[in-house]
Amino acid sequence: MRRRCCISYLINSRPNHAKQIVTASHFITSSFQPLTTMTCFIKPLTLNVFNLYSLVANSKYYKIDAVPCKHEANNKPRRILPVDDQPKHQP
């Protein structure tokens, strides 16, 4: 079952993980806890986030190619690619 939640909840409840998120609308995740996969809309910037595998984005948004899972000690920001550089396909 999928739930739709406000990303601001994550910013408030996990500030150490979500500091770099400036704006986001909402995400869809298979379960709220633990967060294993999610999709959200985020402005292009360097992200340091948990378990974020893909962005659903239009031309002014960017896609993250990899983010560490919450069990990794190292939460370095990962490479962010412009959407225009991504293959255009629907899952």
Swiss-Prot record:
This is Uncharacterized protein AF_0495.
